[in-house]
Amino acid sequence: MSDNSKENLRQIKSYVQRAGRVTKKQQQALDDYASKYMIEYDQNKSLDFSEIFKNSNDVVLEIGFGMGGSLVQMALENPTKNYLGIEVHKAGVGNILYEIEHQNISNLLVMSHDAVEILENMISDNSLSGMQIYFPDPWHKKKHNKRRLVNQSNVDLFAKKLKVGGVFHYASDWLPYAEEVLELLENDNKYKNLYDGFAPRPEWRPLTKFEKRGQNLDHPISDILFEKI
């Protein structure tokens, strides 16, 4: 892929910023807790994870945590890992801020900005022990495929930010998208598949709302786990 093609892909957003309904509880959480648990986007500042988490534990980045239920569960079940979640929709951000505060979660922080810009400008190379993208928008119409978050340009970007040995975990209920991601990663010499093809569903990955919806529609659930080499 040419540099110009990669740049064009970067400029196409993988999401649509909808107004959406924000409940009173979510708005209250945004007002009360954003200063405690949210990191503002600053294109001129690289994050120092040991400073913001106040420890040197491994950091896992999740892009698009939705309402945040599965990410909250993972943070609670893995207290020796730090989690940074990115979500652009206010309702989900408000929801997760409420949970962080009321469940006293100390290893989870949140950002609300374009994930690619955060990765490019605020995440140091070779700094993440894991990246996870669960049930991203499949943009299933062919004319919208270019909006998909996991594309060749971003796969290269993810590899830059992962440590050697860091794991990229993708899950989807839209098989054509999952097959496309699997092919991208299989053909990239910066990654090694931890399984032969698709991975079995990990017991430690919490069930998400979108996964349940996919199951109700009889969509196959695909997990992909690749290690940076």
From Swiss-Prot:
Catalytic activity: guanosine(46) in tRNA + S-adenosyl-L-methionine = N(7)-methylguanosine(46) in tRNA + S-adenosyl-L-homocysteine
Catalytic residues of the enzyme: 137
Enzymatic class: transferase
Catalytic activity, EC: 2.1.1.33
Keywords associated with the record: Methyltransferase, S-adenosyl-L-methionine, Transferase, tRNA processing
Ligand binding (S-adenosyl-L-methionine): 62, 87, 114, 137
Binding residues for substrate: 141, 173, 208-211
Annotated pathway: tRNA modification; N(7)-methylguanine-tRNA biosynthesis
Gene Ontology molecular function: any one: tRNA (guanine(46)-N7)-methyltransferase activity
A Gene Ontology term for the protein's cellular component: tRNA methyltransferase complex
Interaction with RNA as annotated region, ranges: 143-148
NCBIfam families listed in its UniProt record: tRNA (guanosine(46)-N7)-methyltransferase TrmB
Annotated function: Catalyzes the formation of N(7)-methylguanine at position 46 (m7G46) in tRNA.
Family the UniProt entry places it in: Belongs to the class I-like SAM-binding methyltransferase superfamily. TrmB family.
Protein's name according to its UniProt entry: tRNA (guanine-N(7)-)-methyltransferase
Species the sequence originates in: Francisella philomiragia subsp. philomiragia (strain ATCC 25017 / CCUG 19701 / FSC 153 / O#319-036)
